[in-house]
Regions:
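Hydrophobic alpha-helical segments
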Residues: 1-216
């Protein structure tokens, strides 16, 4: 039995019978988070595509790539959004490498997250130079303006950073988005797309729970 089929997503409305208030309130929130505001629906759907690739929800990927296409996103724009997500997911792992360095060195500081720790990242250039250099090249090219602007990519990065929960990445890309011309309203809207997609990933997988529950 396949655990993922498009048709399973059709069971989602069944949740309305079992948790009606929560279901309706989520649908209302999700609709508002993805509606046009300072950011267009197209921009929000591209953010949603990126976040869906981080949550790993196949239902969300299918839905939001379709929505992005309906809102005139090109293959190239969708691909660029996905690569921002790829860079941010990988970047979250690398960024937390500074915590590993602190732990290895026996840093007794009770504060596990300080902005100053991020400066240790360059130490990986000496520890694993070729891999570090290759990642930096990939990260730089993924965030470089092309079919999507630098501002659009940094807003996607902000949403992705909130999805991975990387404090260093949130700090870096929020500042980058601001430098690229994003205002606080646009940044907030990008964050709420991430919030909706993280919640949506959990809800979407409820159809798998329904299938599992119904098995004899």
């Amino acid at each position: 039995m396949s655990l993922y089929k498009k048709e399973y997503f059709g069971r989602l409305p069944e949740l309305k019978k079992y948790a009606p208030e929560a279901f309706q309130s989520f649908i209302k929130f999700d609709s508002r988070a993805l509606a046009a505001g300072k950011l267009s629906v197209k921009q929000k759907e591209l953010i949603a595509v990126a976040v869906a690739h981080i949550t790993g929800c196949p239902y969300c990927i299918d839905l939001h790539v379709g929505n992005a296409k309906k809102n005139e996103s090109s293959r190239e724009e969708v691909a660029e959004a996905i690569f921002v997500a790829t860079a941010l997911k990988a970047g979250s792992a690398l960024a937390h490498g500074v915590n590993a360095l602190n732990a290895y060195d026996g840093n007794g500081d009770e504060d596990l997250y300080k902005e100053a720790y991020f400066a240790r990242l360059k130490e990986f250039a000496d520890l694993n130079g070729e891999a570090f250099k290759a990642f930096i090249d990939f990260d730089t090219k993924s965030l470089k303006a092309k079919n999507l602007t630098e501002k659009e990519k940094e807003l996607i990065a902000v949403a992705c950073a909130h999805t991975t929960g990387c404090a260093y990445c949130i700090n870096l890309h929020t500042k980058n988005a601001k430098r690229a011309g994003a205002d606080l309203e646009e940044i907030s809207e990008a964050i709420f797309v991430a919030v909706a997609l993280k919640a949506g990933s959990a809800l979407a997988h409820s159809v798998n729970a329904l299938n599992a529950y119904d098995e004899k």
